[in-house]
Amino acid sequence: MKNNTDILIKVIKLNSNNLPLPSYSTENSSGMDLYSAMTQDVILAPGCRACINTGIAISVPNGYEAQVRPRSGLALKFGITVLNTPGTIDADYRGEIKVILINLGHETYTIKYGDRIAQMVIAPVIHASWNLVKDLDDDTTKRGDQGFGSTGI
């Protein structure tokens, strides 16, 4: 369903691949599936990682980014996840989207051409400016500087 928050993203297919373009699985999905464009199977042994080509390059509009995230089913069933999650595709990047996958499971996993390997979420970007101060007293909070489990586990 189209609404006023939809944006148009330019995409090119690389190497004459016949893979589908990234797409939403359901009407309310946040992420679009990305596919492996590797022409040879990639064997991921436990603890190993690989950079997987997707066969596409995109032009993200200024003010947005594309985030590459794991697919929950691959993570739960096989321990396959995106290593640098979320992977960031900046608006000025024009190269092929590649996904670094790691096998955190106990069994070898094979990635084949056309497998759904990750999902991509388009998100707005806000650029911050810094205000250098001597202390953060104006921002006193209940939590303060307590971290790493201080609010419970």
Curated annotation (Swiss-Prot):
Give the top-level enzyme category: hydrolase
Q: Which CDD domains match?
A: trimeric_dUTPase
Could you tell me which Pfam families the record lists for this protein?
A: dUTPase
The reaction(s) catalysed by this protein are: dUTP + H2O = dUMP + diphosphate + H(+)
Its EC number(s): 3.6.1.23
Biological function? This enzyme is involved in nucleotide metabolism: it produces dUMP, the immediate precursor of thymidine nucleotides and it decreases the intracellular concentration of dUTP so that uracil cannot be incorporated into DNA.
State the protein's name.
Deoxyuridine 5'-triphosphate nucleotidohydrolase
Organism ancestry: Bacteria, Pseudomonadati, Pseudomonadota, Alphaproteobacteria, Rickettsiales
Identify the coding gene: dut
